[in-house]
């Protein structure tokens, strides 16, 4: 009946759309190191969504709905333990949307250089700026020793995002391997802080076209592979244990 009404061939495939974070999950599975292995994808944008792909035989963790954890379902109907917080919105609420982004590539050396001053001064944003969301939904965000320098301010917010992401990853019992994708994968203070906070985890980013559009394309052709490789992220030079 639908074919008759539309004039489409009876053999045409109709594909339903999927959420961008779910498309990111499909894109990540294009890498051999991720597909079929215990791994977590941290998709970063307005929302930071951590999605764990449990290894074979792994028992799913008990998740806390009150701390913004849930079981998502991937494109193939499989359960995906997940946790989320509004990391991008929180960062932008402090530093602005366009003028002082934390992921501007030419600014990365200066942002990394600002980290020691942030740690030494005790500058820290406490959660939560987007109240009602994330692992600390009832807390009210505020500064400790608010920095005046804009590089230090931006570096502080990257450390804040890494700290909250670290807690969210613990809540879904993330382990072994973590691929950070999306806009904030280019924020070196953020990804390197994650590598520092999770020394037992292989923290990765991709130098390939592996965004959500590629993930949606893999829904049509699951055999597609990314045109690049994964990069292992090195920890920060500074010790974050006291800061944490």
Task: Name each region found by the language model.
Residues 4-179, 186-244:
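Active-site core segments that coordinate phosphate-bearing ligands/cofactors
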Residues 1:
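Short His-centered aromatic/hydrophobic patch
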């Amino acid at each position: 009946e639908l074919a008759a009404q539309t004039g489409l061939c009876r053999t045409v495939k109709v594909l339903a759309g999927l959420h961008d974070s779910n498309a990111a999950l499909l894109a990540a599975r294009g890498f051999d190191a991720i597909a079929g292995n215990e791994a977590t994808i941290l998709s970063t944008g307005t929302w930071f969504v951590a999605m764990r792909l449990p290894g074979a035989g792994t028992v799913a963790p008990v998740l806390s709905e009150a701390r913004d954890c849930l079981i998502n379902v991937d494109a193939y109907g499989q359960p995906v333990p997940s946790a989320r917080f509004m990391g991008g919105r929180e960062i932008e609420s402090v530093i602005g949307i366009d003028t002082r982004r934390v992921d501007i590539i030419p600014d990365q050396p200066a942002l990394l250089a600002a980290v020691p001053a942030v740690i030494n001064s005790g500058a820290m944003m406490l959660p939560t700026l987007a109240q009602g969301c994330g692992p600390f939904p009832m807390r009210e965000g505020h500064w400790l020793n608010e920095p005046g320098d804009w590089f230090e301010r931006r570096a502080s917010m990257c450390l804040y995002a890494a700290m909250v992401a670290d807690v969210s990853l613990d809540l879904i019992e993330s382990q072994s391997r973590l691929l950070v994708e999306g806009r904030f994968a280019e924020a070196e203070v953020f990804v390197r802080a994650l590598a520092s906070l999770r020394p037992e985890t292989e923290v990765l980013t991709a130098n390939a076209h592996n965004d959500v559009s590629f993930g949606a394309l893999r829904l049509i052709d699951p055999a597609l592979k990314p045109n690049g490789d994964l990069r292992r992220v090195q920890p920060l030079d500074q010790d974050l244990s006291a800061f944490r």
